[in-house]
């Protein structure tokens, strides 16, 4: 895809969820500092990105045709210049209403070492909220 996206380090937002980049930074990413660090040997490295109802944000580009394809390599560069590489494996989409934070699909500090990039999807025009989430999984390349 050829995307060079800055990565912010974030904690929890005002609702207690892992933070996201500011809405004005549509092509930035946000690493949740309470998840394993990029390059870790275990668990989900949680990264959040935005998608917009009218397109034109990183999450839209990842999901829509021409976006991430199985086997694509994602390079994550830390503040000290260290590089961790991941190979995109799959994406899942699920309704927010059925999500269980204890399921391990997003929060997982002990499982296989992988990126878990999440974006919101299916904006509800009535409520202004997003009814679905998409998680893109990429395995750590050693």
Label for each model-derived stretch:
Residues 1-142:
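Solvent-exposed, non-transmembrane regions of membrane-associated and secreted proteins
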């Amino acid at each position: 895809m050829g995307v060079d996206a800055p990565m912010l380090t974030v904690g929890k937002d005002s609702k207690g969820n892992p933070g996201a980049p500011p809405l004005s930074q549509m092509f930035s990413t946000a690493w949740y500092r309470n998840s394993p660090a990029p390059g870790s040997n275990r668990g989900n490295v949680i990264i959040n990105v935005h998608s917009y109802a009218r397109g034109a944000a990183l999450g839209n580009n990842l999901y829509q045709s021409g976006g991430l394809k199985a086997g694509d390599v994602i390079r994550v560069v830390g503040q000290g210049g260290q590089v961790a590489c991941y190979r995109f494996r799959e994406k899942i989409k699920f309704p927010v209403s059925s999500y269980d934070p204890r399921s391990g699909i997003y929060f997982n500090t002990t499982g296989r070492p992988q990126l878990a990039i999440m974006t919101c999807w299916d904006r509800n025009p009535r409520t202004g909220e997003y009814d679905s989430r998409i998680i893109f999984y990429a395995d750590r390349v050693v």
